[in-house]
């Protein structure tokens, strides 16, 4: 899915050439993370804090914006790696940092586990046991993190993060891992589930640009994100989009 919006004449020609060599700023938008983006029920267009940030960046660069919407974090990374997008919105992760220059985080999101009401699991430390199966969104921040941290439990990769709870149910898995907001929505919808009380990780959501675009592009994007946090832009966008449970990252987070 793509969507383009017009803009004014280039406000920063040198940066516009780095970020948008094809003319438009192609922003990869991950619809698999409801904290970052959703589809507007009235228009069907992507909306959310990631869309707002992309829109403002394109405005400052003076180039049109093209939204490249995908269903998973893995797809969003592929867009960057395959030159299908110029910028994206990602959880900071060492593996991804091999190809992507990350800004500081603009939002912190908490990762939680969910289990069935009758599960004997009551705490995070009980998850990494032999015989425990953990559903994660393939290529998501949870997948990358838990692939490093879980040594006894078995990770079961579901195609997209929004499908994790359904996969957890359909495959009779032990645990579902994901964004707290998504898990809460799904638990309320299907019933018979509870979310463990403590988060297992904090996800640092940042903007990213291909490393091939160079240090100047990376520095410009990093400065843009810091300004958007300090000005209240990110907080206002989260509030406008009704996002709860995500907090604006502070400098140095």
Indicate where each model-derived feature is located:
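Periplasmic-binding protein-like
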Residues: 31, 108-118, 180, 184-226, ...
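Short loop->beta-strand "edge-of-pocket" segments that line small-molecule binding or catalytic clefts
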Residues: 24-30, 47, 125-142, 154-155
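Ligand-binding cleft/hinge of the Venus flytrap
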Residues: 37-41, 54-64, 103, 128-130, ...
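Short helix-initiation/N-cap motifs at beta->coil->alpha
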Residues: 51, 67-78, 121-122, 156-167, ...
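A ligand-binding cleft/hinge motif common to bilobed small-molecule-binding domains
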Residues: 74, 91-99, 145-148, 166-201
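Extracytoplasmic small-molecule ligand-binding "clamshell" domains
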Residues: 4-91, 96, 228-231, 240
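Extended ligand-binding regions for polar small-molecule ligands
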Residues: 2-16, 48-60, 118-121, 125, ...
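Flexible hinge/capping segments at coil-to-helix
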Residues: 106, 115-133
């Amino acid at each position: 899915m793509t969507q383009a919006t017009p803009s004014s004449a280039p406000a920063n020609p040198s940066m516009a050439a780095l970020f948008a060599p094809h003319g438009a700023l192609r922003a990869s938008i991950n619809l698999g993370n409801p904290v970052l983006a959703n589809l507007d029920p009235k228009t069907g267009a992507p909306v959310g804090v990631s869309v707002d940030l992309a829109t403002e960046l394109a405005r400052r660069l003076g180039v049109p914006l093209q939204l490249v919407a995908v269903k998973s974090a893995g797809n969003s990374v592929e867009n960057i790696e395959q030159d299908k997008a110029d910028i994206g919105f990602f959880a900071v992760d060492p593996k991804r940092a091999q190809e992507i220059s990350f800004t500081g985080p603009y939002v912190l999101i908490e990762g939680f586990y969910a289990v069935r009401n009758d599960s004997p699991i009551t705490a995070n430390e009980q998850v990494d046991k032999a015989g425990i199966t953990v559903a994660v969104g393939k290529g998501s921040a949870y997948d990358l993190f838990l692939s490093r941290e879980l040594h006894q439990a078995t990770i079961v990769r579901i195609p997209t993060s929004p499908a994790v709870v359904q996969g957890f149910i359909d495959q009779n898995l032990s645990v579902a891992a994901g964004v707290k907001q998504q898990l809460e929505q799904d638990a309320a919808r299907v019933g018979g589930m509870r979310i463990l009380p403590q988060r297992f990780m904090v996800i640092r959501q940042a903007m990213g640009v291909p490393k091939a675009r160079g240090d100047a592009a990376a520095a410009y994007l990093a400065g843009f994100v810091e300004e958007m946090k300090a000005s209240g832009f990110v907080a206002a966008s989260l509030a406008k989009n009704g996002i709860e449970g995500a907090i604006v990252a502070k400098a140095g987070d």
